Amino acid sequence: MAKSPRRVAGRRLLLPLLCLFFQGATAILFAIFVRYDQQTDAALWHGGNHSNADNEFYFRYPSFQDVHAMVFVGFGFLMVFLQRYGYSSLGFTFLLGAFALQWATLVQGFLHSFHGGHIHVGMESLINADFCAGAVLISFGAVLGKTGPAQLLLMALLEVALFGLNEFVLLCLLGVRDAGGSMTIHTFGAYFGLVLSRVLYRPHLEKSQHRQGSVYHSDLFAMIGTIFLWIFWPSFNSALTSRGDGQPRTALNTYYSLTASTLSTFALSALVGKDGRLDMVHVQNAALAGGVVVGTASEMMLTPFGALAAGCLAGAISTLGYKFFTPILESKLKIQDTCGVHNLHGMPGVLGALLGALMTGLTTHEAYGDGLQSVFPLIAEGQRSATSQAIYQLFGLSVTLLFASAGGVLGGLLLKLPFLDAPPDSQCYEDQMCWEVPGEHGYEAQEALRVEEPDTEA
């Protein structure tokens, strides 16, 4: 595996310079703008008339722990299925997540909690930043193995900014309801990544085809990610919902939807599989589609039956997408979707947005009673009818797709800059490009025996 001195020198400097520059810049911005909010500032908290039990920390922190584990353990392990890319899948998840959390705190803070010349942060800030990091990691899944760490950091820089802007437009300007992020997280992250992958299309990626598959143990590790995500998804969707009835209803709807998507995934996987055998790719991914599809509607009066029906449909669509639609994406649309984010996050996210609009249009005062204020405040206050709110929900989906597509194009053009050291076509999906790998010299000897055409740079 020959490495030119220029490439080695560039890699040695580029990633450290970007990491140190971004960390230094965010640290300066934190020093200037970021302050504790009323519930975490010692003087402000003790100056108020309340007990320690009233602090939001004790209500939000359990959900934050679950969401945090999903972002770093769930997403990270879900992407280790590639046989020679486990270090990068986990390591770059760690890197992107850490940077995205800091940058999202600033972007979301300026848009949502900036007053008195400062950004005020608390538990909700941490959860919102994790949501943003989740969207970045969804996009990472679409370009997994085909991008270097410097490219990924720049992708995160752009995506976090656009995520924050899209979220602000939907939630604050349009008054859209999206508790579990079917639109703001899953749809945005998926289509940002898919358009990015299209712009970065590699016509000679078959040179790395022998590394694109999984092996027995890599699929087992990926199932760890699946189980983590499956267990904690009710916390993900309910993390920022209201106290009282809102949070438990959101958790229940997500819980039942996940169970249904799992059963439909097993059923469809066996039905379309060779000789009726299950495909681990389907189980690892499509079983989670139930959590995505109820994201928007999870806090609404979906009913347990509605949650089961939505999850069953999402699991089926996701499984069929992996079997039939992913090959079409690559062959016809030239979108190389490494992790199949279109099947797990894209289509279920859009379906979830449509489900949310449907449930919004069916909203009645009788069904929600006094709880209407916490779920649909604009309807409760008489500013909108249920039908008009449903139209706003659909418009929010359109805005999200627009932001994601435009961002993906811009990001793709940015990541094509030649100095960013993209891996060559023959070395995609390979940890040795960036990591010290145990036993790599023996592996290099085997690789040297392969007859390959000259590399084509991205």
Swiss-Prot record:
Maturation and modification: N-glycosylated.
Region listing for Interaction with ANK3, in residue ranges: 416-424
UniProt keyword annotation of Transport present: yes
Coiled-coil residues: none
Membrane-topology descriptor: Multi-pass membrane protein
Function: Ammonium transporter involved in the maintenance of acid-base homeostasis. Transports ammonium and its related derivative methylammonium across the basolateral plasma membrane of epithelial cells likely contributing to renal transepithelial ammonia transport and ammonia metabolism. May transport either NH4(+) or NH3 ammonia species predominantly mediating an electrogenic NH4(+) transport. May act as a CO2 channel providing for renal acid secretion.
Protein name: Ammonium transporter Rh type B
Organism: Oryctolagus cuniculus
Taxonomic placement: Eukaryota, Metazoa, Chordata, Craniata, Vertebrata
